[in-house]
Swiss-Prot record:
NCBIfam families: minC (TIGR01222). The lineage of its organism: Bacteria, Pseudomonadati, Aquificota, Aquificia, Aquificales. Keywords: Cell cycle, Cell division, Septation. This is Probable septum site-determining protein MinC. The keyword Cell cycle applies.
Amino acid sequence: MIEIKGKTLPVIQIKIKEKGNIDKLLKELKEKLSHNIFKGSLIILENPEVLKPEERKKVEEILKEFSRGFIEGKKEGKEKREESRLLIIERTLRAGQRIEHRGDILILGDVNKDAEVLAGGNIIVMGKLRGVAKAGLIGDHSAVIVALKMEPQLLQIGKKKAIMSEADRNSPGYPEVAKIEGEDIVLEPIEGAERWLKLLL
């Protein structure tokens, strides 16, 4: 059985509540995601570990077909649950405003110049990122920063920093993911990041 919840569009949460028959599950998933209301959404997929690798691959193919991209919820121990909780901000952050949270942060709006977002986990901005974004501040160098338009003043993941000049801040027009690769913070199109992008829900 599949449960779909709209956190606040364009973000939806899909939870696989029980394994059951894989063909029936895939059919149900396809039918639900085919509705126009979900078109172009970012999907948070919870409980994918109940599926076999080949079943999971089929689910991922459907998610890629019907969504902007997807993020897998990560199963955590009880001691980490509180600090890894997802914080959702349903507004644009103006200059001088600051959001800080020990877990993951989802911004349903823009982060304007001179606004700051600080997270112990990952940061997702469903809009323009023009301010400062610092992820993985509890020492997590596997954290990522996602934005529909990436034009930041400064990016930080763990202890690694990337300061961007005005000339470097022109977004290519598609969603990007910032992550650590080697000794540097690199940007990649979000379409190529589904396999490693994880949210600590």
